[in-house]
Design a protein with these regions (language model features):
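A short, conserved beta-strand element in the Rossmann-like catalytic core
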Residues: 117-120, 236
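A structural signal for short hydrophobic beta-strand segments in well-ordered beta-sheet cores
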Residues: 25, 155-158, 229
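Active-site glycine-centered loops adjacent to acidic/histidine catalytic or metal-binding residues
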Residues: 9, 116, 242
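Conserved N-terminal catalytic core of the sugar/cofactor nucleotidyltransferase
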Residues: 2-5, 13, 27, 31-112, ...
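N-terminal nucleotide-binding beta1-loop-alpha1 segment
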Residues: 1-19, 76-77, 275-282
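Conserved alpha/beta core of the MobA/IspD/sugar-nucleotide pyrophosphorylase nucleotidyltransferase superfamily
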Residues: 3, 178-283
Length: 283
């Protein structure tokens, strides 16, 4: 298995913070978003290579970071330049995966991740779930009640008995489920090959966007492959997409840590809930 880390975005909402430095190399509590991923991936022996996909603007930043020993991992690390130089000509998340697959000539199992989130779950737990489902495609997330959060990303309707995803939408106006999905995906080899078919259809359909959730949504909607859902509760996945979130990340992490502690001390109670849009925390 190879892990593909999407780092080709421009993070324009973070202003000067990411003007000359990629978001993946920003630090939270002394560790970059990228290093948080690498630490987790080190716990999965089946991953033999980590492929970092950068845009042309920040490619040298990643090469320099690797040379400076700022990518600590026991995996082979390959850094690719997708050739784009602005937000306007970006390839998009799935487009970057397709680019990487072609570049390295790979057709096997794939783990696709973004490198701009803080999280406290273990990626190895999701991988174990993937294996337990006979290596079936896997997305992750948790139950969500906030309409704002549900409309802002990928939303799954999940069979509670089998964990199979019955519908999946990316940024729906009217959500058809209550499970908000994070941008992290496990695909078997057969599904990895379908990425190229998806990209061919995307070129013909302007309604298919750039976000990574459009591919698993396409898989489910068009009955291309089964997808299963791993619930990370009581753990968290924080999209650090705004300056407010980044500058208040210590408060958010403290609240997340308290919620996990509360959950395990009171597993039958429902009082240990952190609002997923973090608005109450960062006021």
């Amino acid at each position: 298995m190879k892990a593909f880390i999407l780092c080709a975005g421009y993070a324009t909402r973070l202003g000067k913070l990411t003007e000359n430095n990629p978001k993946a190399l920003l630090e939270v509590q002394g560790k970059s978003f990228l290093q948080l991923l690498l630490d987790n991936l080190n716990e999965i022996p089946d991953i033999d290579e980590v492929v970092i996909i950068s845009n042309h603007k920040f490619y040298k930043n990643f090469v320099d970071a690797k040379a400076a020993g700022k990518m600590v991992t026991d995996k082979v690390v390959t850094i690719l330049d997708d050739g784009t130089s602005s937000n306007e000509d970006r390839l998009g998340a799935v487009g970057d995966v397709a680019f990487a697959l072609n570049k390295i000539g790979y057709k096997g199992e794939s783990m696709v991740l973004v490198a701009d989130n803080w999280f406290d779950f273990k990626i190895s737990d999701i991988y174990k779930f993937y294996c337990s489902k006979n290596r079936s495609n896997t997305v992750f997330g948790k139950f969500e009640t906030s309409e704002k959060v549900l409309r802002g990303g990928a939303v799954a309707h999940v069979n509670p008995k089998t964990c199979k995803v019955e519908s999946l939408q990316e940024k729906p106006a009217v959500p058809d489920g209550n499970y908000a999905c994070g941008a992290f995906y496990l695909y078997n080899a057969k599904t990895t090959a379908l990425i190229h078919k998806f990209m061919a259809e995307k070129e013909k359909d302007n309604n298919i966007g750039d976000a990574p959730g459009y591919f698993p949504a396409w898989l489910v909607t068009n009955n291309q492959a089964d997808v299963y859902f791993y619930d990370i509760a009581p753990y968290h996945n924080v999209d650090v997409g705004t300056l407010d979130t980044y500058y208040n990340i210590d408060k958010i992490i403290e609240s997340c840590n308290n919620e996990v502690k509360c959950y395990f001390e009171n597993p039958d109670e429902q009082k240990c809930t952190v609002a997923s849009d973090w608005t109450e925390i960062i006021k």
